[in-house]
Amino acid sequence: MAKITTRAENYSEWYNQLVQQAEMAENSSVRGCMVIKPYGFAIWENIKDVLDKMFKNTWHQNAAFPLLIPKSFFTKEASHVAWFAKECAVVTHYRLKNDPDWKWIIVDPEAKLEEELIVRPTSETIIWDSYKRWINSYRDLPILVNQWANVMRWEMRTRIFLRTAEFFWQEWHTAHATAEEANEEALKMLDVYGDFAENFLAMSPVVGRKPAHDRFAGALETYAIEPMMQDFKALQAGTSHFLGQNFGKAFDVQFTNQNNELEYVRWTSRWVSTRLIGWLIMSHSDDNWLVLPPLLAPYHVVIVPIFKTQEDLDDIMNYLRPLFEKMDNASLDAHSKYIKDSIKVKYKIDSDTQKTPGRKFSEYEMKWIPLRVTVWKRDLENWQVEVFNRITEEKTMMKLDDLVGNLENILLKQQNDLYEKNKAFREANTYYVDTYDEFKDKIERWFIFAHWDGTAETAEKIQEETKATIRCIPNEWFVKQNDEWVDMISWKESKWRVLFAKSY
């Protein structure tokens, strides 16, 4: 495979080439939309499988709502829609027809819709239309619903996985009787995202809440996880919102409480998307090939027999049959408080006669399969195989009977090593400053913790002058308020340090 551009040479081109050579995705014939190839989609399926188990273990249920939403629904919550109104795709007609000369297909002007439909940019409005029918009493609450869906936002600047017109995501929309219960739900599910980030994505993000001026439209609180990419930028990888009664009032969703009084329902929402795949690529990969946390890799092990004749291959496959039987029952225990099930070890056998061993090795190193097991016929009598560890790049000879027993330790050590490396990278590139001159000097390649006076005006001034934004108020700083702290620009009182960074 061709050598890829290094991160130092051109970070953006490095990312694009890695996505292409690892056969994860490509641009499609539809502007801004991507084709997710089987290898890339397998990663999304693994993300989805893990998160879905987490959701169900926290008593959430899946549902499906329409892709097309009446435009009038969006007028009920105008402030919410303002965030993405310019990105909405609109359906105006319901039929095509042949032109009079039968040379082309045209839109039938007589098939104009009475009301235009919006291709789902997010589902709050259509879901709350259903909730109005579902909720009458406090006994109907809480509703804990998640949807796996595709979404359309007509992005002008697109980049595979990170920003595309169409993408896949999950969206939670929960309804509650009290504000306390709703906010507790928002925080609990942020913890689910944080657990997933650390234990499966092998990431060490900063966790906190957004400042008031940067909350999700209509939210009373927005919580977020913010990891650092290898180019020192932040990427908002997950958010959780407590929205109070705003949507309950907009859609007139009321319930009778325990005192037989009418109240508006409280609401929370949150989502993550295929953007996570871009996050994984940029967080762990190096200048040579893709690097993935083993727990989310499409395959954990690839087994490559080395043979000259069909007879050699048959002998090797017979030799390996006991291994296959054990591998079929092998599993990995994730250290997550939200996952009860083990993850089944996934393996692949490559006996393709059209590719040389060298080409196979190169392909699996680029795509990053954590362990490669190579089997020569000469090793049959010693009952051993060669194991290549993709993280350490070390080759060891291992007895066949010992291989499956060692798999879990090797793979989970790889997982933990990636997490510790990511955590060390973020901590080594995080700086605490007290003056604006120092801030401007460091912000290009650091996460910066600095005091802020709490005003949108100061945040906007910093963004205009440095392109850095407040990513979040970290949880540990939110509880460390001190009247003696001052903002680095205005010299007004500052209650806490906040995280500043440049971002995607």
Regions found by a protein language model. Name each.
Residues M1-Y504:
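NTP/phosphate- and nucleic-acid-binding module
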